[in-house]
Amino acid sequence: MEGDGVPWGSEPESGPGPGGGGVIRELCRGFGRYRRYLGRLRQNLRDTQKFFRDLRGSQPRGCPSSPAEGGEAGRGPAGDVAATGLPAGQLSCISFPPKEEKRLQQMVDCLPCILILGQDCSVKCQLLNLLLGVQVLPTNKLGGENCKLRRLRFTYGTQTRVSLALPDRYELVHTLAAHQGTWETVPEEDLEAREDSEDAARVLAELEVTMRHALLQEVDIVVAPCQGLRPTVDVLSDLVNDFLPVITYALHKDELSERDEQELQEIRKYFSFPIFFFKVPKLGSEIIDSSTERMESERSPLHRQLTDLGYLSSSLCNCGAPGQDTKAQSMLVEQSEKLRHLNTFSHQVLQTRLVDAAKALNLVHCRCLDIFINQAFDMQRDLQITPKRLEYTRKKENELYESLMNIANRKQEEMKDMIVETLNTMKEELLDDAANMEFKDVIVPENGEPVGTREIKCCIRQIQELIISRLNQAVANKLISSVDYLRESFVGTLERCLQSLEKSQDVSVHITSNYLKQILNAAYHVEVTFHSGSSVTRMLWEQIKQIIQRITWVSPPAITLEWKRKVAQEAIESLSASKLAKSICSQFRTRLNSSHEAFAASLRQLEAGHSGRLEKTEDLWLKVRKDHAPRLARLSLESRSLQDVLLHRKPKLGQELGRGQYGVVYLCDSWGGHFPCALKSVVPPDEKHWNDLALEFHYMRSLPKHERLVDLHGSVIDYSYGGGSSIAVLLIMERLHRDLYTGLKAGLALETRLQIALDVVEGIRFLHSQGLVHRDVKLKNVLLDKQNRAKITDLGFCKPEAMMSGSIVGTPIHMAPELFTGKYDNSVDVYAFGILFWYICSGSVKLPEAFERCASKDHLWNNVRRGARPERLPVFDEECWQLMEACWDGDPSQRPLLGIVQPMLQGIMDRLCKSHSERPNRGLDDST
């Protein structure tokens, strides 16, 4: 229902009041800015959620997205590797934690609103009128003990409209006084909630006033109801779930009442929102010039009370205003003409929310991006190390097999001699033991009378077992001593290597390891085998049984001491030591051959399984490098850039300092507390360049600060670049004096140049220690400060080794030959340093002759691949020349490590710069 009230315009007329058009315009600008950035943040969150949905969708069915969902399922290695390349145990780390997602969703869904609290209803209405710049609410009749002001909400609409609505925004169909006729301010009877009303819903309903006003187009305004009608804490509780409240508290007295203090204490107890305290001028009073007000250094009673309540800090100024870029804090304004401070306060409240949301979102991006990069390293290592492990396992098992076969062949004669020696030394002892032997399960008459054939056989068998057990122990000890040596030498490493290979297969079946154990069982478990009645024992038993069977008698003998010695004597004399040793070694070889063949077959099966797994791993590695990581890096760049622009605003471009292949470098006087700065403006032409830039930014921001690397201060995405025709990424970094190219042209002393070389090596070593490869080390990417100390810049081609795709990048004359094959590592930086060192030692920027003769890049690349290198100049020191040659060696494995290069350089510098002075033409310090 529409009322016939005053059709308030979209722009209030500027009047003498403190809430003039200037304040309203600033508020509109601030809330409009918040909505724009909130829209970008909301879009980034939507893209992030879509990224994680796509990531979950790419996982194979049955693979849990988190431990809570999957439990113990999918623990087998074949089933716990998702299409992301990540084991199931780590999938929870690359998911969007539900609590964080819910919190961020709530943060971006909450639109701002201005909430007006106050000492009484009259002063709240007065502040509302000041904010809108027009008289909307009556102020002279409200307030007092009997006031029952309901909650009021002011929203934007093309027509003026007044209605009642429940808290869930359902509109009540009630006839209001505002509907009855013409009015200038909202009728009082519509503002008050009458408790004697028969309709309970009408008492709880809020009055919604829709009007065409510039400020309401950006933000809703809510006037809190009377404390007696509903506590302020309850009002705030309703609001915070759907809105971000910018809380104002209207004052008209010089001090807070006890009820006011209690209300503020309750708010502080349950909420952490800052509050803008504003002392509203008395009705009809003139605005007093601030020069006649209390001196800033004096603290008013209100200020002291609010300080005691914890809202204000004694370290802030009298108005309680914090600095421009600090976290939002409560503020007290007692001069009515300073309502403009509400702009600063609201800016800080809104900015704090945006920065917190952007920071939380960026943390999710960075955490998951780091996991992807670490997983890329793990996958790359897996691809490199698994074939080597398989080859090592095959080689070592073969060595073990051959060693054990040699033992079997070599030990046969030793066993024969050992058996003869053992029998000779133990013969009397064995005969005595046999004579004194107490038979088991055989009843021998005390008078020595003959017993039956069955008992005789049992007695003979027990005597045989006694002799064999003693002999077996000696043979076992001989074999065990040999195999234990093998076990100590390399079997342990072989077992560990097998375990790591079998980890990625079915954990319940380690067939290959079992066959390895069988190979060893043939020897070092011989003691257990002999004592448990192995085939060797049975073979010995059969051999001795044949000997014993040749002993004949006419009638069963008497079981006497002499008979037992005779049986043992004949058994010992009838044993053939050579045949026994040959049989033992033959059976040992048979076992070895059987286990070796089974091991080889199972290893081939294991290798086939790994071959399929590695093929999938390589696909996953490519997906992480080409899709997952770049996509997430772009989201991270957007969220971090949003955070930077909120905190430090967009930087101002100064004069152009230089141009590169992908961007322009400008001077930037100051940004984010850094002075002076350089600003690199990059306009990515396509998705690939966007992704490369985003990853570059992540690597640079992730690096710890280092004195040999140029600092990156931050980034801002400029959506209005080129008049809005394109989007540019502005990278704000440390500004230095000049680059090495300019320095060499101007002239640098030898000691200075060698120190620069040391600085460059230190910087590259640091990058390598972080797993990064620069890939574009050259004169113009080495910057010098005013003391001519060097820092490496332009990490545009810098990537972790595991994230490199083999693309050909860099500057032609500094590019190592293997770069053209697409297979390279961090030694390409050593090559590039060798070329850079040639320039440093030459002291000029003149191209080497071998490169100067090349008519094109292709010609240059072909010459480099054929071995073309810079020539030796007469001024070169022998050790310097040898170092250059070593660095640009065509074989990457022959290039020295930078940990070796650095002390060599230091030695060269100490020798050349301390032993003799510079030549006149080479010792010119740069005077600029």
Curated annotation (Swiss-Prot):
Annotated ranges, domain Protein kinase: 651-905
CDD domains linked: PKc_Dusty
Record has Kinase as a keyword: yes
Coiled-coil ranges from the UniProt annotation: 394-430
EC number, as in UniProt: 2.7.12.1
Catalytic residues, chain numbering: 776 (proton acceptor)
Residues holding ATP: 657-665, 680
Listed PROSITE patterns: PROTEIN_KINASE_ATP, PROTEIN_KINASE_DOM, PROTEIN_KINASE_ST
Ranges for region Disordered: 1-22, 55-81
GO cellular component: anchoring junction; apical plasma membrane; basolateral plasma membrane; cytoplasm
Keywords: ATP-binding, Cell junction, Cell membrane, Coiled coil, Cytoplasm, Kinase, Membrane, Nucleotide-binding, Serine/threonine-protein kinase, Transferase, Tyrosine-protein kinase
Main EC class the enzyme belongs to: transferase
Localization in the cell: Cytoplasm; Cell membrane; Apical cell membrane; Basolateral cell membrane
Catalysed reactions, as listed in the record: L-seryl-[protein] + ATP = O-phospho-L-seryl-[protein] + ADP + H(+); L-threonyl-[protein] + ATP = O-phospho-L-threonyl-[protein] + ADP + H(+); L-tyrosyl-[protein] + ATP = O-phospho-L-tyrosyl-[protein] + ADP + H(+)
Gene Ontology MF: a single term: protein tyrosine kinase activity
Function: Acts as a positive regulator of ERK phosphorylation downstream of fibroblast growth factor-receptor activation. Involved in the regulation of both caspase-dependent apoptosis and caspase-independent cell death. In the skin, it plays a predominant role in suppressing caspase-dependent apoptosis in response to UV stress in a range of dermal cell types.
Family: Belongs to the protein kinase superfamily. Ser/Thr protein kinase family.
Name of the protein in its database record: Dual serine/threonine and tyrosine protein kinase
Originating organism: Bos taurus
Name of the coding gene: DSTYK
